[in-house]
């Protein structure tokens, strides 16, 4: 019984001493500087990673353009021209106002069709 009490007392004493040493330890300014530098380096690494990712994403476009033959370039130019023409034609004729519609067109209005 005495040995059990002694073991419990020694265990409690060691825990109290360990906690006292940890809380009473002076803070090291070098440790704080090291942590701040490591946090700053991590932020720099994220920016660097974003930069390299942007470079990697732009590289396949460059290699594809270099690998294109003159025939492919002419086809690509034709496709671009067709796309521009479609955009121009879509933008040149805006949607007509309801009053400018042709006579005889029908709109759905409250359960019935009405002519314009």
Curated annotation (Swiss-Prot):
Compartments (UniProt record): Secreted
Q: How is it modified after translation?
A: C-terminal amidation of the neuronostatin peptide is required for its biological activity, including for the regulation of mean arterial pressure.
Q: According to the UniProt entry, where is the signal peptide?
A: 1-24
Supply the name of the protein.
Somatostatin
State a single Pfam family of this protein: Somatostatin
Coiled-coil parts of chain: none
Using the UniProt annotation, give all residue ranges assigned to the region (Disordered). Answer: 62-82
Record-annotated membrane-spanning stretches: none
Q: Mind listing the GO molecular function terms for this protein?
A: hormone activity
Q: Where in the chain are disulfide-linked cysteines found?
A: 105-116
Q: Which domain of life is it from?
A: Eukaryota
Q: Which residues carry this modification: Alanine amide?
A: 43
Q: Which GO terms describe its biological process?
A: cell surface receptor signaling pathway; cell-cell signaling; chemical synaptic transmission; digestion; G protein-coupled receptor signaling pathway; hormone-mediated apoptotic signaling pathway; hyperosmotic response; negative regulation of cell population proliferation
List the keywords (alphabetical).
Amidation, Cleavage on pair of basic residues, Disulfide bond, Hormone, Pharmaceutical, Secreted, Signal
Q: List the propeptide residues.
A: 25-88
Q: Which family does it belong to?
A: Belongs to the somatostatin family.
